């Protein structure tokens, strides 16, 4: 169907699992499971609902007549009532007790929470796999020296693996926030039109204990520890904000990673995966653009901005509820999850297939290391050669200025080390100088830090989630 808009989050970016979570089938069958849980619980607490009625409801959880539902919604202009009528049409015996005492938000809001939990679990699975891939990458390259950058200007060397631990640490923070939200998510429960439980109190002839028990039973049947203690007709929309805040955090981390990869690609120190028939540019046939990292940045920007929808919606609710949240939430919440799913799939694909070019890293180090090594040279020549610290400092300054001019004005290579080696004031041999400028001597505790981080921070997480490891990371385009 090419004469209508289709969402690229589904056609290009998000995986099948996340698309299923936010599919009509999953949404409306969850509505029906909630209706079954309500009827079962009401029967258990003494309302006149028969086993035959319950069996009829259970038998028709997934066979949803969408055409019939669309016709009913066109008539009644109310999606929940349309599906009440649709469910009732295939469960005629149970129709009289369907949705008994409930309001629309009983199925709507509770389903939103259930789907968000399912979606967070899928995001967690992807996130753990990305962390594992980063850990493998960091371990593999923990001792590979590379130039570090501050302000994107050359700084003291680090290692490729140590840099990867920075990316992984951001994701561990995101995982911690995700786990917190999963642990604290609760259902709306069944509190009626304004959150007072009045309709259920009437059903149970004023028995407050039965109203409380009803909600507990429903929560247990739906796999939740409980409901939010108080609510209006809806659960607080701050819940949506807090959940989307987790996704925004993941997007921030992924965007930072993608920016680093794009810059490293420009430096020719890494290449992201590139298919045999892939085209980088329609005009420049030689190009290998970091398009997957660019796509991560693009989708991340969307998720970060989407958080504002949840913030504004939460702030704009009136009293016990208003409907100005509805249309926005139908779009903003699923799309945040679909986009984040796409982001993490791309992240996993890139880091698993990332090619590192040590010779290019060494080349860039060689260009800058002479300047970075001057302090070590100065100290060695004072301590081991008996040199005058001030005289040596002035000699280094003069040679550094001259070498810098040669590089910047003449486009030449950095010959600072050759100048120092040729200057008798230093008295250095080639072997001595080579040892003083060994890149590994300038990476500090990078290897130790990487090993410690992987052992103490990453390994416990991967051990906890062993069953989640092994996700595929196929990219559609």
Regions found by a protein language model. Name each.
Residues 38-41, 123, 127-130, 134-137, ...:
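Amphipathic alpha-helices that form helix-helix packing interfaces
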Residues 302-387, 395:
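Long, amphipathic alpha-helical stalk/connector segments used for oligomerization, subunit docking
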Residues 271, 394-402:
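Active/binding-pocket-proximal capping segment
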Residues 162, 241-249, 376-385:
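Short, well-ordered beta-strand elements within core beta-sheets of diverse protein domains
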Residues 1-198, 206-217, 280-281, 291-295, ...:
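A helix-coil-helix interface module used to build multimeric assemblies
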Residues 139-161, 271-287, 320-327, 352-372:
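Glycine-rich cofactor-pocket loops
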Residues 234-269, 278-339:
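A conserved active-site cap/scaffold subdomain adjacent to cofactor or substrate pockets
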Residues 208-233:
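Active-site-adjacent "gating/activation" loops or surface patches in catalytic cores
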């Amino acid at each position: 169907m090419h004469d209508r808009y289709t969402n690229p989050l589904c056609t290009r970016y998000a995986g099948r699992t996340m698309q299923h979570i936010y599919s009509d089938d999953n949404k409306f069958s969850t509505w029906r499971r909630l209706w079954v849980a309500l009827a079962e619980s009401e029967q258990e607490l003494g309302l006149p609902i028969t086993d035959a009625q319950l069996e009829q409801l259970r038998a028709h959880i997934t066979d949803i007549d969408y055409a019939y539902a669309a016709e009913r919604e066109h008539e009644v202009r109310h999606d929940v009532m349309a599906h009440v009528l649709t469910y009732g049409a295939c469960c005629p015996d149970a129709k009289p007790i369907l949705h008994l005492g409930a309001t629309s938000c009983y199925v709507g809001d509770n389903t939103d929470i259930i789907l968000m939990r399912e979606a967070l679990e899928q995001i967690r699975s992807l996130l753990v796999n990305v962390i594992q891939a980063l850990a493998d990458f960091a371990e593999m390259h923990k001792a590979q020296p590379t130039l570090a950058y501050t302000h994107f200007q050359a700084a003291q060397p680090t290692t490729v693996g140590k840099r990867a631990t920075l990316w992984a640490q951001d994701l561990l923070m995101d995982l911690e926030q995700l786990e917190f939200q999963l642990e604290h998510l609760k259902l709306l429960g069944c509190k009626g039109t304004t959150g007072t439980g009045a309709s259920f109190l009437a059903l149970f002839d004023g028995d407050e204990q039965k109203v409380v028990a009803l909600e507990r039973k429903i929560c247990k049947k739906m796999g939740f520890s409980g409901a939010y203690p108080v609510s209006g007709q809806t659960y607080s929309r701050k819940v949506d904000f807090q959940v989307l805040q987790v996704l925004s955090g993941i997007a921030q981390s992924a965007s930072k990673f993608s920016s680093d990869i794009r810059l490293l690609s420009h430096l020719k120190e890494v290449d992201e995966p590139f298919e045999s028939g892939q085209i980088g540019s329609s005009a420049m046939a030689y190009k290998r653009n970091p398009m997957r990292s660019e796509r991560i940045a693009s989708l991340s920007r969307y998720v970060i901005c989407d958080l504002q929808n949840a913030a504004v919606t939460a702030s704009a609710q009136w009293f016990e509820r208003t409907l100005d949240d509805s249309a926005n939430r139908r779009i903003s919440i699923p799309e945040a999850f679909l986009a984040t799913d796409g982001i993490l799939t791309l992240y996993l694909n890139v880091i698993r297939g990332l090619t590192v070019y040590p010779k290019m890293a060494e080349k860039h180090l060689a260009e800058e290391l002479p300047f970075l090594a001057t302090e070590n040279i100065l100290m060695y020549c004072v301590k081991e050669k008996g040199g005058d610290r001030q005289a040596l400092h002035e000699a280094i300054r003069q040679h550094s200025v001259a070498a810098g001019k040669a590089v910047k004005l003449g486009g030449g290579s950095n010959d600072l080390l050759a100048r120092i080696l040729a200057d008798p004031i230093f008295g250095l041999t080639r072997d001595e100088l080579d040892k003083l400028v060994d890149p590994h001597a300038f990476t500090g505790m990078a290897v130790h830090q990487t090993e410690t981080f992987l052992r103490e921070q990453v390994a416990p997480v991967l051990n906890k989630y062993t069953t989640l490891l092994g996700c595929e990371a196929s990219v559609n385009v």
